[in-house]
């Protein structure tokens, strides 16, 4: 990729679909490099989920985070507060 694509016009569902397609491709390549990249992606996504939870909580509430994640407010706060 030579330039940063603009994803601002995509819906959340469309962006997720791109992630799924790329993840599927990496997971079926069967190479050491693809596996290593996939492990790094998993770690990165984990970090970004925390950022998303804190952002949602800041603009709404930890109750919203709990509802979306299917857990209690306390559990959501303990998992993603920092």
PLM segments and residue spans:
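General nucleic-acid-binding
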Residues: 1-27
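Short, Lys/Arg-enriched anionic-surface-contact patches
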Residues: 28-51
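Short alpha-helical segment immediately N-terminal to, or the first helix within
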Residues: 54-56
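Residue-level signal for the short linker/turn that defines the boundary of a DNA-recognition helix
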Residues: 59-61
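The alpha-helix within a helix-turn-helix
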Residues: 65-66
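Key DNA-contact positions within bacterial/archaeal DNA-binding proteins
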Residues: 74
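Key DNA-contacting residues within the recognition helix of helix-turn-helix
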Residues: 77-78
């Amino acid at each position: 990729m030579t330039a940063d694509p603009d994803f601002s016009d995509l819906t959340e569902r469309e962006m997720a679909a791109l992630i799924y397609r790329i993840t599927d491709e990496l997971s079926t390549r069967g190479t050491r490099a693809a596996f290593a990249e996939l492990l790094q992606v998993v770690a990165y996504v984990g970090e970004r989920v925390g950022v998303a939870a804190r952002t949602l909580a800041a603009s709404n509430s930890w109750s919203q985070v709990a509802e979306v994640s299917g857990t209690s407010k306390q559990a959501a706060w303990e998992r993603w507060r920092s």
